[in-house]
Amino acid sequence: NCIFTSNFANERGGAIFLNDANATFTSCTFSSNTNGSTGSGGALDANNSRLTLSACTFTGNTSGALGGAINGASAALIFADSNFTSNVSQLEGGAINGTNASLVLTNCSFTSNQNASFNGGGALNVKGGTLSDINGTYTGNSCAPGSGGGAIQWAGVDANFTETSFSENQSPSYRGGAIIATSGNLQFSKCIFSDNTSGARGGAIRGESVVLSFFESNFISNQSTLNGGAISASNSSLSTTRCIFTSNRSNGNGGG
C-alpha cells in the first residue's frame, strides 16, 4: 500500500533500484517517476533479482532509454492483477523492458503505453528468456514510427498467451500492429486480436524466423498497409486450429 510519485534517478530506477534482491510489492502505486536520458526503469529497475507485484498500478512513468515503468535484466518478473497506463520509454518497452528475463503476467492490463523514438514494443520489449501471459489486456499501445510491435516486441523468446486480448494497438510505419517477433516459439490459445493496425506488414502480428501456433483465437478488423491484414510471417512455421478471421484488410497481399 505504498505510493511512489515524481521520483527521479539519473540512471536506473526512477523510484527503486534492485540488485541481487527478492522484492514483493502489493497494492502499490507508481506514478510520474522518471530517469535520465540513458536511464532504464522509469519507476523500477530489477537486476539479477526476483520481483513480485500484486494489484499494483503504474501510470505516467517515463524512461530515457529502456522500460518506461519497469526494466528487468536477468530477472524473474512475476506480476498479477496490475495495471500499466500511459508509461513512455524513448527506446524499448513503453511499460516493461526485459532482457534475459522470465516474465509471468496474470490478469494484467496495458493501456496507452508508448515507446517514443526508436526500436519498438509500445507496452513490452523482451529479448531472451520466457514470457507467459494469462488473461491479459493490451489496448491502444503504440510504437514510434520506424519501429515495430505496437504492443509487444520480442526476440529469441518462447512465449505463451492464454485468453489475452489485443485491441487498437498500432505500429504507424513498420511491422506488427500488436506484435512483432523475431525468433522464438509463440503459442496463442483463445486470444482475440481486434482493430490493430500496421503501416507495413502484419496488422496484428508479424513473425520473422519464428514458430507461430494459434488455437481457437479470433482476428477481427485488423489492417496493414502492405501484406497480411491480420498475420504476416517470413521464414516461419505457422499453424492455426479452429481460428476465425473476420473483416481483416491489407492494402497489399493477404487480407487475413
Which positions does each model-derived feature cover?
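Right-handed parallel beta-helix
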Residues: 1-8, 22-34, 50-62, 76-88, ...
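Extracellular beta-strand/beta-solenoid scaffold signature
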Residues: 8-17, 36-46, 62-71, 88-97, ...
